[in-house]
Design a protein with these regions (language model features):
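Bacterial Sec-dependent N-terminal signal peptides
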Residues: 1-29
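Extended hydrophobic/Leu-rich segments
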Residues: 10, 14, 51, 118-121, ...
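Flexible, surface-exposed loop/linker segments and immediately adjacent secondary-structure boundaries
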Residues: 23-48, 54, 68-138, 142, ...
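Short acidic, glycine-rich loop/turn motifs
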Residues: 36, 65-67, 205-207
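Short, surface-exposed linear segments at secondary-structure transitions and domain or protein termini
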Residues: 51, 55, 83-88, 175-181, ...
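N-terminal beta-strand/beta-hairpin edge segment
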Residues: 53, 60-65
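Beta-strand-enriched, solvent-exposed domains that form extended recognition/catalytic surfaces
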Residues: 120-226
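Short beta-strand elements
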Residues: 207-280
Length: 280
């Protein structure tokens, strides 16, 4: 009897493992281009991939973001660059490159929508990647920590075409403005992408010509319309799970932090609240 019981347990485990291995992935975003190797069709948001499917990327840097059947979040990206004479290596099997995200702790550390003002710009921007939804974010800072006026200002320092660029952030009383148009247009040329790498943040005092570096990070501006469409792809998936609106909002914010990095807490909360509450 014991042997029979053990065989049943092993059988059930094998079935469970088989089902898990066959878990499908719903594409939510594609960076670059990706093609279904078997059908020859270009992948798009909403397409479903099976573990055994093969995908061909247009470049090594392209990747796919997806959600699995059990609501896990996955990135599919090549692990190693192909050799120049082996472009066929841009074709991979889904199960070999689907990697679950591991950045939920970032949201736990950085998502603080209840904060009325920022007392630590290093903690706010971080030292890795900071994203802005749309083209502008307003940052109310603590006047005790950062007294912004005609003498004390916040400056972004970065490089464009290998030339140094310094940009003073606009402000109104103690509210700072990070504005895409003003940062992208420089005397050294206009930045065509949505990212400015290695942005150093300084508190600069004009009278004494002294500066203090606060932090350094990669700044990314996220297209609001594209993000809206991406979340609209995800919403029906979550609703099919009978999730409440509050749980859906939490999931979308976690998703954002997983794949876009840290952002302004009030901005992402307002964006998700409006999207979920107004969605039909």
């Amino acid at each position: 009897m014991k042997t029979k019981f053990n065989l049943i347990v092993v059988f059930l485990i094998m079935i469970g493992s088989s089902l898990l291995a066959q878990e499908s992935y719903i594409v939510t975003r594609i960076n670059g281009k990706a093609m279904n190797y078997k059908t020859g069709t270009q992948l798009k948001a909403g397409d479903v991939l099976q573990p055994a499917d093969r995908v061909t990327f247009d470049t090594f840097d392209s990747y796919i973001i997806s959600i699995s059947q059990n609501m896990g979040r996955f990135m599919m990206k090549m692990h190693e660059p192909p050799s120049p004479d082996a472009l066929q290596q841009l074709t991979v099997t889904v199960k070999d490159v689907a990697v679950p995200t591991k950045r939920r702790s970032l949201m736990a550390e950085r998502y603080k929508p209840e904060e009325s003002e920022i007392s630590d710009l290093k903690g706010y921007f971080g030292s890795d990647k900071f994203s802005v939804i749309g083209s502008k974010v307003s940052i109310p800072v603590n006047p005790t920590t950062y007294k912004i006026d005609d003498n004390k200002i916040i400056v972004f320092y970065y490089r464009v075409n290998n030339n140094p660029v310094s940009k003073q952030l606009g402000y109104d009383q103690n509210v700072l403005f990070v504005e895409k148009d003003k940062l992208m247009a420089t005397n050294s040329g206009t930045i065509a992408s949505n990212e400015i790498p290695s942005v150093a943040v300084y508190l600069y005092e004009k009278n004494t010509r002294t500066s203090e570096e606060i932090t350094k990070f990669d700044l990314v501006f996220v297209d609001q319309e594209a993000l809206t469409n991406e979340f609209y792809t995800i919403l029906p998936i979550l609703r099919r799970q009978k999730m409440s609106n509050d749980d859906i909002k939490k999931y979308l914010i976690e998703y954002y932090f997983d794949f876009y990095g840290a952002t302004d807490s009030k901005s992402i909360k307002q964006f998700v609240d409006q999207l979920v509450d107004n969605a039909k």
